[in-house]
């Protein structure tokens, strides 16, 4: 089975659970680029209702670690786009939504660049994230 088929096969949509393959990438990116500091209870899944590439939402207003990252399958047709979008959404979580796309977000993006997140092969062999 190829990468894309494996990622989509049996993916839950709105059941409150992560898509296992997406969650594995979340954990990998968390370790590699966020020092494992992001919460592990984040739900990471395909979302058929997501109109944008991806979106992160709070799952519980009283739990500062409870987030859902939803990805639109059609707007993430490649590994590069999907994992770039995931890093983007993870950066929002790292900032706890205190800075939408302002100076703190820019600083976080520069940190990802410095750590090599967008170098060819940084996450998947022979793939560059954009």
What are these regions (language model features)?
Residues 1-84, 93-130:
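Active-site-proximal or metal-binding-adjacent scaffold patches in catalytic folds
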Residues 89:
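Walker B catalytic acidic pair
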């Amino acid at each position: 089975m190829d990468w894309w088929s494996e990622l989509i096969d049996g993916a839950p949509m709105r059941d409150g659970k992560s898509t296992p393959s997406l969650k594995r990438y979340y954990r990998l990116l968390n370790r590699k680029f966020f020092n494992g500091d992001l919460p592990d209870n984040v739900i990471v899944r395909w979302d058929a209702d997501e109109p944008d590439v991806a979106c992160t939402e709070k799952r519980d207003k009283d739990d500062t670690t409870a987030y859902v990252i939803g990805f639109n399958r059609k707007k993430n047709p490649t590994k590069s786009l999907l994992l770039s979008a995931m890093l983007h959404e993870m950066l929002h979580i790292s900032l706890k939504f205190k800075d939408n796309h302002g100076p703190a977000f820019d600083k976080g993006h520069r940190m990802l660049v410095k750590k090599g997140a967008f170098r060819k092969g940084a996450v998947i062999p022979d793939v560059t994230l954009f």
